[in-house]
Regions:
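Membrane-embedded and interfacial regions of multi-pass energy-transducing membrane proteins
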Residues: 1-222
């Protein structure tokens, strides 16, 4: 978790530097960097607004969902929480690995979206419909990646809850648990409440894009 999250953080940091560089020199060609991108994204080395939106959407997603959260919860939390409650490991180590591979797969799918026709997601990292239904193919990849990441978070939340409830050392009541363990437990419960509707919305958006449904498309509203 830690090494993978750090790699994603470095990539997100690079996107941020590219955005700030263009903001520092508006309407000017970026030396060296501008030559590395195609004319469809940076004609003459000047960043198009659509490409800037792609960088903004992917930067926000990567830093939050692929960097900070996996580093703080997946890496630090999975290591520290069992130590603080006297457990040898998390309740479901294999579920932990499944959560990691969902996280890794989601991150890779998101990064691949930069190389598909039309580029990465442009509708913002919150991906509100109906704008998200009309974006490029990269938006589809972004949605698939988000579904993987949400699934990873749900699996991890279940693991944290069961570990905290079932594997506490004898004599440790809820009132004696460290504040960090309480924070992870409450956060896990909140994720179980908030993320299933979010994942369902992502699946419905995917169906609008790929299966011809109209859950969010204005044309399907009565």
């Amino acid at each position: 978790y830690g090494l993978t999250a750090l790699l994603f953080l470095l990539f997100g940091f690079g996107l941020m530097l590219l955005m700030r560089w263009q903001l520092a020199y508006p309407e000017q060609a970026l030396p060296v960097i501008g030559a590395l991108f195609s004319e469809s994204t940076m004609p003459g080395g000047v960043m198009l607004p659509e490409f800037y939106n792609q960088l903004g959407a992917m930067h926000g997603t990567i830093m939050v969902f692929l960097g900070v959260v996996p580093l703080a919860v997946g890496a630090f939390g999975n290591y520290v929480l069992p130590l603080q409650i006297g457990a040898q490991d998390m309740a479901f180590p294999k579920l932990n690995m499944l959560s990691y591979w969902c996280f890794f797969a989601g991150g890779v799918v998101m990064l691949v979206s930069f190389f598909v026709p039309g580029g990465a997601a442009q509708s913002g990292w919150t991906s509100y419909p109906p704008l998200a239904d009309y974006a490029t193919t990269g938006q589809t990849y972004w949605l698939i990646g988000m579904i993987f990441l949400i699934t990873s978070s749900l699996l991890g939340s279940m693991n944290f809850i069961v570990t905290t409830i079932q594997l506490r050392v004898p004599g440790m009541s809820y009132f004696r648990m460290p504040i960090f363990v309480w924070a992870q437990l409450v956060t896990s419960f909140l994720l179980l409440l908030a993320f299933p509707p979010l994942e369902a919305a992502g699946v419905l958006q995917l169906m609008d894009r790929l299966a011809g449904t109209s859950f969010f498309l204005p044309s399907g509203l009565v």
